[in-house]
């Protein structure tokens, strides 16, 4: 497995003190993912990312995150879920291993577990969860509060 890019974005909470932020997105996710896409040469995330592991501490967080990652059009994430696009046989499988709500939320270790799942997938070792053709995986992790947090994005692929 090869790390194609890794980005961090930190928020000091200033966006929550202005009326310009309505709480429907996470600025750090948008910043970190766009930087990662740019550096990894990804122009069409929805078509190029083939699997994701995201910080799904709450159901709404996963939905908002998929929009912030440009894997769903803003305001249309629920349609993508209902259409099955994030299912294991969908266009962009998400949380193939069940995510945080399945594994629990080991604070400090959540990101490592996500990367491990992408490692298993890219090396064909995920057993019954194995995707047919994983090419690029995206890992998204958060820490903090919606208005004041740090976001980590990793894009991984096979070692060429």
Predicted regions and their residues:
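A short beta-alpha structural unit
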Residues: 8-13, 50-59, 99-100
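A glycine-biased, small/acidic residue-tolerant capping/turn segment at secondary-structure junctions
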Residues: 71-84, 126-132
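Condensing-enzyme catalytic core mediating Claisen C-C bond formation in acyl metabolism
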Residues: 4-35, 83-97, 130-136, 141, ...
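Phosphate/pyrophosphate-binding loops at sites that engage ATP/ADP/AMP, CoA/4′-phosphopantetheine
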Residues: 32-48, 126
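Active-site-proximal alpha-helical scaffold in enzymes
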Residues: 106-126
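Acyl-CoA/ACP chain-elongation machinery
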Residues: 12-16, 57-62, 111-112, 116
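Short glycine/threonine-rich loop-to-helix capping motif typified by GTGT followed
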Residues: 17-22, 55-78, 106, 145-153
């Amino acid at each position: 497995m090869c790390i194609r890019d890794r980005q961090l974005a930190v928020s000091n909470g200033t966006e929550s003190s202005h009326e310009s932020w309505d709480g429907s997105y996470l600025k750090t996710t948008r910043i970190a993912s766009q930087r990662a896409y740019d550096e990894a040469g990804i122009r069409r995330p929805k078509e190029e990312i083939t699997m994701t592991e995201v910080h799904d501490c709450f159901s709404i967080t996963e939905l908002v995150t998929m929009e912030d990652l440009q894997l769903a059009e803003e305001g249309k994430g629920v349609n993508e879920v209902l259409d099955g696009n994030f299912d294991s046989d969908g266009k962009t499988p998400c949380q193939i291993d069940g995510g945080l709500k399945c594994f629990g939320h080991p604070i400090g270790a959540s990101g490592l577990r996500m990367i491990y799942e992408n490692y298993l997938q890219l090396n064909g070792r995920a057993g019954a969860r194995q995707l047919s053709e994983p090419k690029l995986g995206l890992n998204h992790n958060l820490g903090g509060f919606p208005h004041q947090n740090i976001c980590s994005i990793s894009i991984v692929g096979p070692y060429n």
